[in-house]
Amino acid sequence: MSNGAPFPLDYRGTRNYGPRFIPDRYSTFVSSARKSPRTPPGGSDQVVHVNDAGVYKRTFAVASPFPKSEFFYSSVGVGDAIGAMTDTKKHRVRRSILGPRLRAKAIAPYTPSLQKLVIACMDIMAGKARQGKVINLLRYTRALTVDVISDFTFGRPMGVVNEAEEMPDLLNDLEVFGRHFHILKHFPISRKLLDIIPESFARKLMPLPGFFELREKATTAVNEAVVERQAGKTISNNTDGASFLDLLLNQIDENPSVLVDEGCAFITGGSDTTGFTMENATYLILSHPHILQSLLQELDTSPHIRDTFDLDHILRLPFLTAIIKETLRLYTPAPSPLPRTVPAEGIDVHGHFLPGGTILTHSLYLIHHNPVLFADPKSFKPERWLGTQGKVLEQYYVPFSKGSRSCIGMALAYHEVYTYLSLLFSRFEMEIFETSQSDMDWREHFFVKRNGQLRIRIVRDRWTGEAFPTRAVEADLR
């Protein structure tokens, strides 16, 4: 423990690579502790980062007495959303409303719609390839994930997949806001000011590019849904299940600002992390030819992808599953330390007593990169998840966190990633185009943002045999 350590929730520096630098500075299980400039009223003056899987299991267990820390989650810009709730009773009620809609069995009827969106993305990508253009993969993965999560949230997709622009406005707003998320995180007063001052003044006062545009789009969607509801119409346009707005309006009398918070949170969290995983998996597979060949062998021998798409079967493909797990381990989508508040009785951590009110943080990234748990943790080794060894490692596999506050959208995210990867690699022969490891390195803004972009060139359509121009030209990226 060190009182001279940098504030563990503030890793911004010149390179801003977040928790990856903690193990280099601290070799003990307690990585850092210091007086926090943002201590909650009546709380302890310590923020302690613990890099210990056993303590993590205790802190993040089901019905854990360690609640989310209000001083942090109230500042993230969507305080009324389920992911930011710090009141355990309110969270339990909200999860009981939304949780059943996001279980695997409830999602299953959506598979044909999901498959249709993925194929639409790939058809557009093939059209670009015919023109000899390079594919900016983020444009298509984020369009796909935004359309999926908006369909679940508002009852209709936002239609980003089929927009003609190289970078549609909504995707640009999400990307820009993601890169400025740290402003809300490190200056929590800015979120409170947004609630009490006119928006026109707030836009000039606070440098939050993308935030206002995102809330404006979510507000429009919520207002349209409420008007339809008042007219006696069902909000959802699809037959695969009720939208989140339907469910919330059925169960509780929520005011529009709460619904907007929930909408913004689902759109941001449900698109950014899933799209990030799709891109990382694509890069890692194409960067390791022997892994690509093993994956193609598994996909090509399956009759449940091209001919009759059977997601239940695809979810059980062992090597594809190993690739996805290893991608989520190596590139954990939410690496930022997750703060929890120590209950009143305190906790003993390996001989260190932490009093009630202490802010205790854990990083999922550090668990996934602990060399004691994962041999050669910086290497991409999907085979570690196969057989008996893989079953042993499951207890330390936490990309969506654990316990009562684990990611509510986990099953939907898996459905999207499995569908995307199985169809993409079954259909296209691809290669990485002028993308370096430096481009793939990330910066922590609670979620993660890369230094550069992943660009690929599609060489051939394996389903039709069509070969695309071998001399690719830069896409017109904005």
UniProtKB/Swiss-Prot annotation:
EC number(s) recorded for this UniProt protein: 1.-.-.-
Pathway where this protein functions: Secondary metabolite biosynthesis; Alkaloid biosynthesis; Mycotoxin biosynthesis
A GO BP entry: secondary metabolite biosynthetic process
Designated name of the protein: Cytochrome P450 monooxygenase asqL
Residue sites binding heme per the record: C407
Lineage: Eukaryota, Fungi, Dikarya, Ascomycota, Pezizomycotina
GO MF, one example: heme binding
Cofactors required: heme
Pfam families per the UniProt record, alphabetical: p450
UniProtKB keywords: Heme, Iron, Metal-binding, Monooxygenase, Oxidoreductase
Biological role: Cytochrome P450 monooxygenase; part of the gene cluster that mediates the biosynthesis of the aspoquinolone mycotoxins. The role of asqL within the aspoquinolone pathway has still to be determined. The first step of the pathway is catalyzed by the nonribosomal peptide synthetase asqK that condenses anthranilic acid and O-methyl-L-tyrosine to produce 4'-methoxycyclopeptin. 4'-methoxycyclopeptin is then converted to 4'-methoxydehydrocyclopeptin by the ketoglutarate-dependent dioxygenase asqJ. AsqJ also converts its first product 4'-methoxydehydrocyclopeptin to 4'-methoxycyclopenin.
Family: Belongs to the cytochrome P450 family.
Class in the EC hierarchy, top level: oxidoreductase
The keyword Lipoprotein appears for this protein: no
Organism field: Emericella nidulans (strain FGSC A4 / ATCC 38163 / CBS 112.46 / NRRL 194 / M139)
